[in-house]
Amino acid sequence: ASLNYWAGQLKTGAVTQAQLIDLFMEQADFKDRYGPLVRLYTAYFRRIPDYDGLMHWYKNMYPDRGGKGLSLSEVSALFSQSEEFVLTYGELNNLAFVELVYKNVLGAEPAGRADWLNRLALGLSRGEMMIGFSESPENLNSSRIPNSITMAFAGMLRRAPQNVEHAAWLVELK
């Protein structure tokens, strides 16, 4: 629907401001595009994605002029080779990578370490492994509120929340 339509809905009281925000946040083209990218960012770097970085990767995944953008798997592979990742964690062997993923994404000890090491040895990429964790039911559940805050700031304010803002909203929404 157009901007005029939603403005009319607000003006007539058909929806409240809060309801409109909820409607926008639940739109598939917003939630299904930004959500996986925000979760992936958080899984790799354990921080709120900066707005410019988030938009850079979003635009690479969903180019304005059509055409084929990067897949989430390709972005994940690039994250695993990024300067920030290497400077933060160093060069990691597969065991260290598996342990890092469990810690960063699930905050848990690597209970399935042997299985993931075997999958990596058989050719699973680190990027695909990270997506498996960032899109896991456990992470989807535990990251829902924090990532919703980040996505709301990006979608409505065109910026990332500052850490103090993010923390305040976490307290408010939990």
Please tell me what each predicted stretch does.
Residues 1-174:
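Composition-driven recognition of low-complexity segments enriched
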